[in-house]
Amino acid sequence: MRGARGAWDFLFVLLLLLLVQTGSSQPSVSPGELSLPSIHPAKSELIVSVGDEIRLLCTDPGFVKWTFEILGQLSEKTNPEWITEKAEATNTGNYTCTNKGGLSSSIYVFVRDPEKLFLIDLPLYGKEENDTLVRCPLTDPEVTNYSLTGCEGKPLPKDLTFVADPKAGITIRNVKREYHRLCLHCSANQKGKSMLSKKFTLKVRAAIKAVPVVSVSKTSYLLREGEEFAVTCLIKDVSSSVDSMWIKENSQQSKAQTKKNSWHQGDFSYLRQERLTISSARVNDSGVFMCYANNTFGSANVTTTLEVVDKGFINIFPMMNTTVFVNDGENVDLVVEYEAYPKPEHRQWIYMNRTSTDKWDDYPKSENESNIRYVNELHLTRLKGTEGGTYTFHVSNSDVNSSVTFNVNVNTKPEILTHDRLVNGMLQCVAAGFPEPTIDWYFCPGTEQRCSVPVGPVDVQIQNSSVSPFGKLVVYSTIDDSTFKHNGTVECRAYNDVGKSSASFNFAFKGNNKEQIHAHTLFTPLLIGFVIAAGLMCIFVMILTYKYLQKPMYEVQWKVVEEINGNNYVYIDPTQLPYDHKWEFPRNRLSFGKTLGAGAFGKVVEATAYGLIKSDAAMTVAVKMLKPSAHLTEREALMSELKVLSYLGNHMNIVNLLGACTIGGPTLVITEYCCYGDLLNFLRRKRDSFICSKQEDHAEVALYKNLLHSKESSCNDSTNEYMDMKPGVSYVVPTKAADKRRSARIGSYIERDVTPAIMEDDELALDLEDLLSFSYQVAKGMAFLASKNCIHRDLAARNILLTHGRITKICDFGLARDIKNDSNYVVKGNARLPVKWMAPESIFNCVYTFESDVWSYGIFLWELFSLGSSPYPGMPVDSKFYKMIKEGFRMLSPEHAPAEMYDIMKTCWDADPLKRPTFKQIVQLIEKQISESTNHIYSNLANCSPHRENPAVDHSVRINSVGSSASSTQPLLVHEDV
C-alpha cells in the first residue's frame, strides 16, 4: 500500500514539473482563448471516509485559487493542489477552482462519518410567504428518506411542503406565520437506522401586508410661552424595519428634540414610541406636527396641533339671554360656557354683588384631555319674588379673571295690600306685583262676593317698591264713593301676566253717610276646594312616607367605633369623617367595561384607569357608582363608604381604595379589581377538583425567595399606595404538580413587560393548604380592621374577593349587592340582615361588636371548609331557628375541616362574647396549622407590600367590649396599623 502511494506521489510531482515547463515556455493566453479549469479526480462528487486523505488537483494555465464552501462559510487556498490529510465531517462541501478569467470548475466532497450524518447551521429564520432553507446538508449521500420530522414525535403542519437537497439542506416552501416557533429535525435512514439532527426552531419574520398604525398621545396642545411641549407618537408594525420621524408642516426649522424607545410585544407586533419635546415653547413654535411612518407596503401619518399663547386667557359665552324672566315658584338654570387656559382655579356666583351661592355645577364640555371649554350651571329653584336681581359668574386662573352678569326678574302674581279704607269719601286699593299690575273696579248692589259692573277709577299711581329695579311694582288706584247711590259691594281686582287677585268692600247708607259694613278678602268655594285637596294630598304623602320608611333601608355595613360605654358602642358618623381630595382622579381617564355586580340603587363596573400609577400606564380597576334610581340616602351612603375606605388606609387583605371622582358628576369610588370574583363562587367551582391532602413543598420556599429577591428594589422604592397585581413570569421550573400550582401563583406577582406563559389561578386545583391560607389571610384582614376600630357586620365568603396569587381581599359590596333578591338576607324589622352569619347578641339585641365579627368569622370558616355550602343547611330562618340558636345549637364540623380548625370555629361560636378569641389570637392559632413555607410566603409578600403590617391591636386586652360592668367610656380612635 505504501509503495503504491509512493508511485502516485512520483507521478504527481512529474506532472507538476511538466505543467511548470509548459507554462513557462508557452506565450500568454488571451482572455478569449480561456477554458474551464480541470479538476482531478474528474468527478462531480467525491465520497471519502472520515480520516482519509482528500487530494484535489486543479490544472489550468491561468490558475488563481481554490475555494471551499459549506453552510455559507468560505475558505481559500492559492495552491493548485488541495490536500487534507485526515478528512473530517466538516470538510464536506463544495470545492471550486477558479482561474484568472473568472471561469471555475467544482467538485462536491462528502466525508462519510457514522457519528455525524448532518452538518448543522443554527438558528433557523424564515420570512412569511417565502421559501427558507433548513441548513442540514448530509455527510453521506447514500442515506434514504432524507426529510423533516417534528420534535418529540409531533406531526408537521399538514400544509408544510419541502424539497430536500443532500448538499444544501431542506427547503421549506411558502413559509406561513403559523409555522412560527415550529420545532423540527432533519432526518434520514442510514443502514436501516433512523437518524435525527439537532433540533431547529423556526422563527418566522412576518410579511408586511399593511401600512404602520400610527397614533399620538394628544391631537392638540395649548401652551403658554415657556412651558414644555411633549407629545408621544406610537408606531405599531409587524417588524422593526419600519421607519419613522417627526415633521413640522410648512417649516424646516424647529428646536424640537426627539427620543425613541422600542420593544417587541408578542411574536408579530413591534412598537416604537417616538417622543418629541420642546423644552420652552414659543409663539412661533405653533403649528402642525406630523408623525410619519413607512414600511415596504406604504406610509401612514398622524398630526397634532400646537398653539402657544403669550399668556393665559378666559372667554365666557352665556348660553342664554342675560336678562331672564321667570315666574314665582319656578326653577331656572343660568348656563354659561367658558374657555380657560390654564385651567380655572376659582369659580363663584355672586348675588347682588353681596352674597355667594354654591348651588352650581362645573364640568368639562368634553372628556377629551385637550379640552379647555367648560360648562357652569347655577341652579335657582322655586324662586321667590324677593330673589330677583343680578347673578354674576366670576372665573379666574393664574393669569386672568372674567365675569358675566345675568339680570333675573321674578314675575309675581299681584297682591292686594290695602283695600278697606274709606277716607274723605275716597276708597283706595293698593296692589303690588311684577310686571306692573292693572287694577279694575266693579260694583254690585247688596252683599256679594263677586261683582261684574265695571266702575272707572278716579286716580291711578304707580311706584317702585324699592330702589332695586328687580322688586315688585306697587300700584295705587282710588275711586270716589259718590259714584255709588245704593247699598252694595265694591270689588277691587288686580291682575298681570302671572295671575290675579281681588278684594271687596261692603257699605250701606245710614242717613246721608256711607258706613262700612264688612270688609273681607274673597274666600271662594274654589279656594275651599283647593285647601281640602291639599289636605288630602298631605295625608297621602304622609302615608307613602311611612310606607317608605318601613321598607328595609340601605346603610353602610362597616362601622368605625369612637368609644364604648358599657354595652353601648358609639359610632362615628361616617358623613363627618374627612375626605382628602388627593384621592380625586379625572373621570375622563376612566373607560368603563362590563358590570361586575348590581343592586337596587348601585353597581360595580370593571373599568380601565389611564395614568393612575404612571402617566402612560393603564390599570384595570373596579368602579362603584349609583344608578339613576338612587335617592339622597343612597348618595350619602356611597360618600360615606368612600370616607370610611380613605380613613382605613391600605392593607393586602382588604379591597383598597385607589381613587374617586366626586366633582363634576356623580360620585365614583375606584377600588382594586379582583379578577377571580368572590370566594364563595370560587369554592363552588373548585369542588370537583379539590385535593384533600395537604402537600408540603419545600422547593416553594426557594421559589419565593428567588421571587422576592427579584422584586427587592421595586418593593423598597415603590411609591404606589397599592400593589399592582398584573400577571408575570415564573423563572423556576416546577418539578411536581404542587410546585406547578404554587409557581403559577407566584408568577402573578412578578412584574415584567412580557406576556406570561403560565397557568391562571382559576385553572388550578384547590387543596387543603389553600383553604388554610384563605382562613389565615381573612383573619389578618379582620385584625387590621379591628385595629382601625372598624366593625364589618357582614363577614361572609360572598364578601371576600380573590385576585392574582390567590390573595383574598375583604370587601363590602354595599349598594352594589341586590340584597332584595338574595336569600341570605332576611327581613327583620326595617332592614334585611344576614341572620345565619350573625351572633346571637346581634340577632336578639341588635348589638354589633368586634366579638360579633369573630362569630361571623367562625361561620365563614364553616363555609370555607365545606367548599361553599350554605350554613345551617336545610334550616329556614324562622321561630324554630331563633329558638335553637338561643338554646346553644351549633353546626357540626364541615367535611374538609381539620380538627384544629373546627376547634377554632367552636371558640368563635361561644355564647359568651368575652370568651371568643380576638382576631390576633386567631391569626396565631392558624399560623400553627399552615405549612412553614406558606407562612414564610405570606410574611415576605406582606413585607414587600408598600404598606407593611404592624402588630394588630388586641381588642380583648385593650377594652372590655361587651357586657362588662367595669368597662368605662374609652376613646378608640387611636391610629394603629396592622
UniProtKB/Swiss-Prot annotation:
Lipid bilayer topology: Single-pass type I membrane protein
Main enzyme class: transferase
Modified residues (Phosphoserine): 743, 748, 823, 893, 961
Domain of life: Eukaryota
Post-translational events: Ubiquitinated by SOCS6. KIT is rapidly ubiquitinated after autophosphorylation induced by KITLG/SCF binding, leading to internalization and degradation. Autophosphorylated on tyrosine residues. KITLG/SCF binding promotes autophosphorylation. Phosphorylated tyrosine residues are important for interaction with specific binding partners.
Residues at the catalytic site: 794 (proton acceptor)
Site residues, Interaction with SH2B2/APS: 569, 938
Protein name as it appears in the record: Mast/stem cell growth factor receptor Kit
Native species: Capra hircus (Goat)
Protein's gene: KIT
